[in-house]
């Protein structure tokens, strides 16, 4: 695990007594080959290329898995741009693939914004989505968490071989990983005050023409979701089933965010042992460029620090390209770099 942000300023001589450690393979082959994985999260600071990396990973996984789903939980919903295809809140097949599906959700909108396909007739839909939103608004964070819970229930029911999450920036990502705890805490609070809010719930049900329903019945309905939540929570903390891939660029602020994310993942007991360093500049000796050389020098400094701090991680180095990675064909081409280290012009 990382030594901590403070270690970035340590002079090189302080590492002289440390034994040499053989660097781990600089690819995501370990992820592709670990067939027990069911949940793969890709995240990091905004603007570092998370979506391109997560879509590329999903493409590579689709070549060896029966069915793959990539979910965007980022309100920006860039996977539609990456594949040049419009996706919705329901899993849709990616053009050109028989076993790769994509969907985009915005958990911050809450349960009431999810489509009817997410709700079983005898469960949340029968209570009315608007009432659910009103009831949940009393518990900070639980509406978003319940939205995650319903998505997980849907996804688990479809039995995808593996699910890749293209996550929002760090704060949203940590809420996603903590949603089981938030839901359980919210339900506990609901049980404490159920007698006080029972008239409100009954009134809402009558207004919606749903008949009488008291707080006990609402709590019972919500508790039906708990087995799924607890199952997912256990899987998230199992390194055989879940891992997190950090994406960053070789700059101080991005590395700082990556270190903070890794520390938070450790607190959540979420496995992480892969870092993608994106947008690296590799000067071409045949086409001198002072700015490129200066940029390369700065990036090399942070790369050296990363290799000292994260010696137990697979560090994948990806180049800054002169074009956008947009469309299924370009994503497929770029995805090869996840399995084969990039060779800059000077090394060819």
Swiss-Prot record:
Binding site for ATP: 45-46, 49-52, 251, 278, 319, 321
GO cellular component, one term: nucleoplasm
Effect ascribed to mutating residue 46 to R: Abolishes ATPase activity, dominantly inhibits the TA protein insertion pathway
The keyword Nucleotidyltransferase is annotated on this UniProt entry: no
UniProt modified residues of type N-acetylalanine: 2
Residues that hold Zn(2+) according to the record: 289, 292
Keywords: Acetylation, ATP-binding, Cardiomyopathy, Cytoplasm, Disease variant, Endoplasmic reticulum, Hydrolase, Metal-binding, Nucleotide-binding, Nucleus, Transport, Zinc
Gene Ontology BP annotations: protein insertion into ER membrane; tail-anchored membrane protein insertion into ER membrane
Enzymatic reactions: ATP + H2O = ADP + phosphate + H(+)
Entry keyword Metal-binding: yes
Disease: Cardiomyopathy, dilated, 2H: A form of dilated cardiomyopathy, a disorder characterized by ventricular dilation and impaired systolic function, resulting in congestive heart failure and arrhythmia. Patients are at risk of premature death. CMD2H is an autosomal recessive form characterized by rapid progression and death in early infancy.
Family, similarity comment: Belongs to the arsA ATPase family.
UniProt cross-references to NCBIfam families, sorted A to Z: GET3_arsA_TRC40
Protein name per UniProt: ATPase GET3
């Amino acid at each position: 695990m990382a030594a901590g942000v403070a270690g970035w300023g340590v002079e090189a001589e302080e590492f002289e007594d440390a034994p040499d450690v053989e660097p781990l393979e600089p690819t995501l082959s370990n992820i592709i080959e670990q067939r027990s994985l069911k949940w793969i999260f890709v995240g990091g600071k905004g603007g570092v290329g998370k979506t391109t990396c997560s879509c590329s990973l999903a493409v590579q996984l689709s070549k060896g898995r029966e069915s793959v789903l990539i979910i965007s939980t980022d309100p920006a919903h860039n996977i539609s741009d990456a594949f040049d295809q419009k996706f919705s809140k329901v899993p849709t097949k990616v053009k050109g693939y028989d076993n790769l599906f994509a969907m985009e959700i915005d958990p911050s909108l809450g349960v009431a914004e999810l489509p009817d396909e997410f709700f079983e007739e005898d469960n949340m839909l029968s209570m009315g989505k608007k009432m659910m939103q009103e009831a949940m608004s009393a518990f900070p964070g639980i509406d978003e968490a319940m939205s995650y819970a319903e998505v997980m229930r849907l996804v688990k029911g479809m039995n995808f071989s593996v699910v890749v999450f293209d996550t929002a920036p760090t704060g949203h990502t940590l809420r996603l990983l903590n949603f089981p705890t938030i839901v359980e805490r919210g339900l506990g609070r609901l049980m404490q005050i159920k007698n006080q809010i029972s008239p409100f719930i009954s009134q809402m049900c009558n207004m919606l023409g749903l008949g009488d329903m008291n707080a006990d019945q609402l709590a019972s309905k919500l508790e039906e979701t708990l087995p799924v939540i607890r199952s997912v929570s256990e899987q998230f903390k199992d390194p055989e089933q879940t891992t997190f891939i950090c994406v960053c660029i070789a700059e101080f602020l991005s590395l700082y965010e990556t270190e903070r994310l890794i520390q938070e993942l450790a607190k959540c007991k979420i496995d992480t042992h892969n870092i993608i360093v994106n947008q690296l500049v590799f000067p071409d000796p045949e086409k001198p460029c002072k700015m490129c050389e200066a940029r390369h020098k700065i990036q090399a400094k942070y790369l050296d620090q990363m290799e000292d701090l994260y010696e137990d991680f697979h560090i994948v180095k990806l180049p800054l390209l002169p074009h956008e990675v947009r469309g299924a064909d370009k994503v497929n081409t770029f995805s090869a770099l996840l399995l084969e280290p990039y060779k800059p012009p000077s090394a060819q």
